[in-house]
């Protein structure tokens, strides 16, 4: 991947079929909607705020007439389908979707496309041919998280795995990628696997229920989606030493890590960025304004946080948020160019202020 803040350059030949609009004049009277399938963790809550902030900025600039946001609380596909069906009756020109299922929403998405509505699915994807997808680089996130935790454990010891939001498009590939890494460490024994549903409260309860029956845990590999501090809380409430826990880039987790560094605590933190919602918004606006050649499937880079950068990220990440970066239209277009041209994905710089 490119270094943070760099922009890949491409030749005209590499970008010959890509055409991005220079204005948003075509969408001044349009209403854009966002359908989100889950609100139970800081990642999704940060994502909702990110998308809304960009929509409000676009509305203030005269790029859109208005926007709508509909949320389902518990990742229920049937409820999300009903909400999208209601949007189809309101005259929206585009719908951005964070999907409850890789397949269950396909019918209603195809219905939207048949009505001429532009559909961009991001973070947790669906699988129709008509949608545009902006996903997270799951192999990189999961592989680096598992690799980092295995190395912290010295390649041996007892591990607990905390799975994420089971049923979404990203969870099973993430879990499988972690298991693939662990195959290279035969002296690491997975002694417990629990489901945290990417929720701090659910992860805390699930881990707390297992701790009395477990041997010493030398590392906890989480899903990195809003559950890590639930694991930490379970150990703290049990008055047990917190082992290395793969953190999820939440402000609360970064504060915990920063405060624990003087005592020698080590961990790994890399995660998808909820700011992908801002890139999805601007991609949608590009499409509505006549963009040509945007790939149907694109990826956004994760945010790795290290001991060298934690103080910077902690300073701009409120406790209730996830470390993220708000993409501008120009930066979204750079991301589109990188995906189109096959170059490295540009990592966002550390923001200078909280989103």
Question: What kind of feature is each model-predicted range?
Answer:
Residues 1-355:
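A residue-level marker of the well-folded mature domains of exported/periplasmic proteins
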């Amino acid at each position: 991947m490119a270094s943070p803040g760099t922009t890949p350059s491409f030749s005209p030949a590499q970008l010959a079929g890509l055409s991005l609009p220079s204005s948003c004049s075509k969408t001044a009277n349009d209403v854009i909607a966002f359908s989100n399938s889950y609100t139970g963790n800081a990642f999704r809550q940060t994502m909702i705020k990110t998308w809304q902030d960009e929509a409000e900025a676009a509305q203030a600039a005269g790029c859109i007439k208005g926007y709508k946001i509909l949320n389902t609380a518990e990742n229920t596909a049937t409820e999300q389908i009903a909400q999208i069906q209601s949007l189809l009756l309101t005259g929206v020109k585009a719908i951005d979707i964070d999907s409850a299922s890789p397949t269950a929403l396909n019918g209603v998405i195809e219905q939207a496309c048949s009505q001429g509505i532009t559909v961009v699915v991001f973070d947790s994807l669906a699988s129709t041919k008509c949608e545009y997808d902006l996903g997270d680089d799951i192999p990189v996130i999961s592989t680096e998280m598992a690799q980092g935790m295995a190395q912290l454990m010295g390649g041996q010891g007892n591990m607990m795995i905390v799975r994420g939001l089971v049923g979404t498009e990203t969870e099973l590939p993430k879990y499988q990628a972690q298991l693939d890494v662990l195959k290279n460490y035969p002296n690491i024994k997975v002694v417990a696997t629990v489901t945290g549903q990417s929720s701090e409260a659910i992860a805390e309860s699930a881990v707390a229920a297992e701790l009395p029956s477990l041997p010493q845990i030398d590392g906890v590999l989480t899903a990195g989606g809003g559950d890590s501090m639930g694991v930490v809380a379970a150990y703290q409430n049990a008055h047990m030493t917190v082992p290395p826990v793969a953190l999820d880039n939440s402000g609360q987790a970064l504060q915990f890590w920063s405060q624990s560094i003087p005592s020698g605590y080590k961990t790994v933190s890399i995660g998808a960025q909820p700011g992908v919602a801002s890139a999805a918004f601007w991609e949608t606006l590009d499409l509505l304004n006549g963009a040509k050649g945007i790939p149907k499937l694109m990826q956004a880079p994760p945010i790795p946080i290290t001991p060298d950068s934690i103080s910077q990220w902690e300073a701009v990440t409120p406790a209730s948020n996830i470390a993220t970066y708000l993409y501008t239209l120009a930066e979204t277009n750079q991301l589109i160019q990188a995906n189109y041209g096959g170059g490295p994905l540009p990592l966002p710089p550390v923001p200078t202020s909280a989103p």
